[in-house]
């Protein structure tokens, strides 16, 4: 499995759907999404599926 990356940061609307779905608490959302614990990412893609804006990608 890969790791999460941010591909369209300007499209982030800070809804929090991604961080609320992540089982590893890798993401934090304030004004926009940030990857706070990248080494903890298990590459499950839950955050990618939850994001309505397509901001995230697992590579």
UniProtKB/Swiss-Prot annotation:
Role summary: Ferredoxins are iron-sulfur proteins that transfer electrons in a wide variety of metabolic reactions.
Requisite cofactors: [4Fe-4S] cluster
Note describing how the cofactor binds: Binds 2 [4Fe-4S] clusters.
Binding annotation for [4Fe-4S] cluster 2: 41, 44, 47, 51
Residue sites binding [4Fe-4S] cluster 1 per the record: 12, 15, 18, 22
Domain of life: Eukaryota
Keywords associated with the record: 4Fe-4S, Electron transport, Iron, Iron-sulfur, Metal-binding, Repeat, Transport
Protein's name in the database: Ferredoxin
Keyword Aminoacyl-tRNA synthetase in annotation: no
KW Transmembrane (keyword) present: no
Spans through the membrane: none
GO molecular-function terms, A-Z: 4 iron, 4 sulfur cluster binding; metal ion binding
């Amino acid at each position: 499995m890969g790791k999460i990356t941010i591909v369209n940061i300007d499209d982030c609307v800070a809804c929090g759907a991604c961080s609320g779905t992540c089982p590893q608490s890798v993401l934090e959302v304030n004004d926009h999404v940030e990857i706070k614990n990248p080494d903890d990412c298990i590459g499950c893609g839950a955050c990618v599926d939850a994001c309505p804006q397509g901001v995230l990608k697992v590579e």
